[in-house]
């Protein structure tokens, strides 16, 4: 293989990405829309790149062909009664990546939850499926610092009861969640 571009989103694996090594640069070029832990070393060494875009812009970049997608690898739930597999906890850029891909390869995992919304794909749209039954990878939860907790309390006081939130990863988001425990809904 030569000149294969591997585009990823939020990598949660703690170890370095095995494809992001200097000796493999002729074969693989790692790119990400975030700076995930598993690519930080490679990015510092110039072996991997960040795609300078907001998360919300990535679907447009896929659909416009600015980031072409030949093959999309994804993890999905088992199909529902209508044959749809949910992207579950990965309902971000993979939906548009899969939509634009020439080939779609799915790891179907019974542990992937079915989630509401349009982030799903019909099993007939998958070119290959690998059945896997393994717990989902979890992001380690960092302990919020005292400053994180003060910021979290300030933010939580501004959030009305019943609000819908998108929460990131890190000490401050965890502090916000902790501070929201007094909210009822």
Regions found by a protein language model. Give the residues of each.
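Conserved alpha/beta enzyme-core scaffold
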Residues: 1-185
